[in-house]
Amino acid sequence: MKINEIKDLLQADSIDPAILAELAKDDRKGVQKLLVSYQRRQEKLAKQKEEFLGRFSYEKDFWAKGQLVGGVDEVGRGPLAGPVVAAAVILPEDFSLLEVNDSKKLSPQKRLALYPKILQEAVAVGVGVMDNKVIDQINIYEADRLAMKQAVEALSTRPDALLVDAMNVPVDLPQLELIKGDAKSNSIAAASIVAKVFRDSLMDDYARLYPDYAFDHNAGYGTKDHLEALRKYGPTPIHRLTFSPVSEMVGLKKAD
């Protein structure tokens, strides 16, 4: 077999052990190099599977009782502009998207690739959005909780319990609050991906409305370019007027 053919063969995730044994006898350096690369990839995949299954430990407690459990997370607490977005996701027991993890650990491209797959494979997905005006009226913490409540209530199937990333959702359901839950639960991780992609899409839309602020790049966070635009043009209708330094800028404009 030619080395290029062997290279193509070893791209598969699972290969007949008999074939691997035969290739191990091949003394060509190129073949042995390909085998080493294959083994490393298999070890990485095995570790990924082990970690993925480990992030279902909380869900399994509920599944063992025949219960549906939803993961809840939010994104957009820290930006100076735009809404806070929450998502609630109920995953099936046979969910197997190994790359699902805390959205902060994934590239934008990976999140975008996983987003439609999560929507397709989940039992139910709900999204909640609280805009900057609500945030200014009731504070970011309470707006977070309302967005999470809205997300849970938007689920087409009602869960028996919730796994929540470090917060309590104001709904009448048993809840387990997990610190850094998006790194401990696949359900919360899936929710974090949905919320992040959904919010990023909203900020892309706002970038077209307010091109001077580069919301498609900074997602509303206080980057250098964003702050310079704020100083030059002032706040937009989507800025959080109670957040510093926006609040100080608004105060200065009023004083003028």
From Swiss-Prot:
Listed CDD domains: RNase_HII_bacteria_HII_like (cd07182)
Enzyme Commission number, as recorded: 3.1.26.4
Cofactor(s) the protein needs: Mn(2+); Mg(2+)
Annotated GO MF terms: manganese ion binding; RNA binding; RNA-DNA hybrid ribonuclease activity
Cellular localisation: Cytoplasm
Assigned keywords, A-Z: Cytoplasm, Endonuclease, Hydrolase, Manganese, Metal-binding, Nuclease
Record bears the keyword Manganese: yes
Cofactor note (record): Manganese or magnesium. Binds 1 divalent metal ion per monomer in the absence of substrate. May bind a second metal ion after substrate binding.
Listed Pfam families: RNase_HII
Family membership noted in the UniProt record: Belongs to the RNase HII family.
UniProt-recorded name of the protein: Ribonuclease HII
Native source species: Lactobacillus delbrueckii subsp. bulgaricus (strain ATCC 11842 / DSM 20081 / BCRC 10696 / JCM 1002 / NBRC 13953 / NCIMB 11778 / NCTC 12712 / WDCM 00102 / Lb 14)
Phylogenetic lineage: Bacteria, Bacillati, Bacillota, Bacilli, Lactobacillales
Gene name in the database record: rnhB
